Amino acid sequence: VQEFKLLLNTHAKVEKDHTYDKSKKHKDMMERLDYLYGKDRQITFNKFDIHLLSYEEIKSAMEKQGIFREDIYSNTIEIANKVEDYDLQEGLDLLPVQYRNPDKELKDIAMQGLKDKGLLEDPVYVERLNDELKVIKDKKFGPYFLVVQSMINWAKKEGIMVGPGRGSSAGSLLCYALNITDIDPIKHGLLFFRFINPERNDFPDIDTDIQDSRRDEVKDYLVRQYRHVASIATFLQFKDKGVVRDVSRVLNIPLSDVNKVLKLVDTWEEYCSSRSTDWFREKYPEVQVYGEQLRGRIRGTGIHAAGVVTSKNPIFRYAPLETRSSPGSDERIPVVGIDMEEAERIGLIKIDALGLKTLSVIKDAISMIKENHYVDIDPLKINMEDPKVYEMLSDGYTKGVFQCEATPYTNLLVKMGVKNLNELAASNALVRPGAMNTIGKDYLARKHGKQNVSYVHQVMKEFTSDTYGCVLYQEQVMQACVHLGGMTMADADKVRKIIGKKKDAREFDVFKEKFVEGASKYVAPNVARDLWHDFEAHAGYSFNKSHAVAYSTLSYWTAWLKYYYPLEFMFALLKNESNKDTRTEYLIEAKRMGIPVKLPHINDSDIDFKIEGKGIRFGLSAIKYISDNIAKKYIDARPFNSYKELEEFTFTKGNGVNSRALNALKLIGAATFSDNPRNDEDIRQNLYEVLNLPEFNVSLPAHYHAFIKEIEDYDEKGSFVIMGMVKSIKRSKGWSRVEVLDKTGSVGIFDEEQTTIETGQTYLILVNDNRILSAIPVDQIKGSSSALVKFLNYKQLPFTNEEMYVVSFKPRITKAGKKMASLTLADTSRDLHSVMVFPTSFAQAYMKLEEGHAYKFTLGKTKDGTVILEDING
């Protein structure tokens, strides 16, 4: 609706006339409107009567509906005439609680917090805390800290799980002393000035993660405590890659093309100018035309996920207020009709309490551990340096571990071999887009001893030794500016913001001169300039260390629970996961860990998952066609003593269940009785269809996943490994087309006519240019001697940089009757390469090559880029 209004405001026409449809401006508007409201919404411009109605037209339309009265018109005019300009005031003092002496109260609580942590006698901590308190007092931020401390203290007393920290507030010792965060900033080398810059007047931003299943209780507390509370509106825009995706969807451009081009760019500017996108822009020029018109416009509105504002007086006195449906409920909640920055400018106090599912998982796991083992687990008291936990992460067993389970992160942890929290925090910074391809390569090489650790000056060693001399964090940029460049910490924070956000170049040059001048006292001017250039090049990828340490702490907590209490942890994951694909991954992981996953049964299952003995039992609601409501009806009516009894209940009128539900129960073995015996073949064939669960009979080593490509990223060119269930096989003369399915999608791959692959089975498949070279059933991987499995199992590769390993050599006959082959090679970086062996090289390759061995090759390329075998050296 807002975008629609914007369009009307751009080119509004008072009346229709004969030039209406011919107007170029209106034609432009029509096209944009067709994009926004056409095709996917079945609405086109022609269905709208877009012009400003005259009084006569409005009157006529209302009279036809029998609702027109003269006072409607006159009252509307009267109200309109009463509307006056209203200047939004800024910088108001709207803190909801007026403490008599907030600074003293804050200091008393903080010092008691230090004492409780056994740090009150440590002069380093006391001095740092006093320094922070002075800044807070000077900025008059004390009441804000007391409000946040009160909220978090209440939540913890109520047994609501609160995160260890989030964002730059984890760098504050005051927040640690107040128990707002659980991260010791001195121990981890975190900076208060990254959180609050004394030269900035903006309010501090303390972000807090709250157990998502109980976040509403925290909001209710704020309403009870401070009365005037509202959520914050968000305004979503058409921008960057989203514009390309939205326009492409409406223009029915193939999703495969869209996904391919969006992997090549990050911004709209890159899309419009990069040579790598030329092919897409030439093929679909209208995407850029419409995208330019839409970029920056409002796409929709929402409610801020974490932020609420509070005030000492009714909020509507200072800002527009509306009510909206609360996400996930039928209740309507008050929302300020401005965004977060505008709310802060007015003086409304923003409190960030973000619901985080991981905290609900941890809370549920701890509760089940206490119930099953009579042990009270406090995450703040567990051993944070347990080598077994870090070894599990380094082996790639990351499924369910907070932030670490995505494939790129898992791959990074395997490459790194993390051994402590510092390295886990570094991984949190390195996994960010761009970081791994820049500073990350040096970090890994230095960590593994392949590159010498060096420092521009010894002063840098103090704060970069943990990262092997690499500048990964924004805090390290700030420390270099202070300790090497002689700048103030306030100026250093400005440098961080300027470099990271590419702000005003003139201001940037001023600080560059300051840094080079100061650093030249320690190093040569050209070295100082080079170091600044490195900051400039890498700062866009550098990360907030405070946030990295806080979230890595949360990652470690989940990893620790997974290692020591796998049953309770996996149950908690499943209980809190609503996404079926993710839940499927967790079920597969549970089976890999040796946790029996019991199929549902009408007499034994609850609505959702439950722990049963040493295993996890499926809930009835996980079955296709069975909702929570239907599951409850069955549970209320059980036990059923026979299939006939179950059938009679299902078909009894008024019970609210149907034959589809009964059939699904039967197919998955959930309706097994003496008069309806279990059919294992039916169950195997229907696991995916009915439970969304592929059949994985054996554990798959976690490091395999580093080499497995998801089907949504499938490319018909190249050599790679996929894993999926065979959904169907279409046989034809000379070939078979095998449709393979994983959690991201499906793809058709070609195999020989007499393929040995079976439907319903899950395979590890080596693909070369859209052909299957080898397919190993997952339940046969453990005993397989194939070259592919050997390669995947190597921890140390048994060949040199000059050699390449033969993963697969598959001969075939050309149409002319000549012999050629598809060859898949692996290098020491573990990358796979697709190589074509033409008839001229076939005899030599056939005689010399053996799968599972390494050789020195001479490779070439054809004009179309196909890699070909030219010679085998030795």
What kind of feature is each model-predicted range?
Residues 1-86, 202, 326:
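Alpha-helix N-cap/helix-start capping residues at coil-to-helix junctions, especially the first residue
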Residues 16, 22, 32-36, 40-46, ...:
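Noncatalytic, beta-rich nucleic-acid-contacting surfaces in large DNA/RNA-processing enzymes
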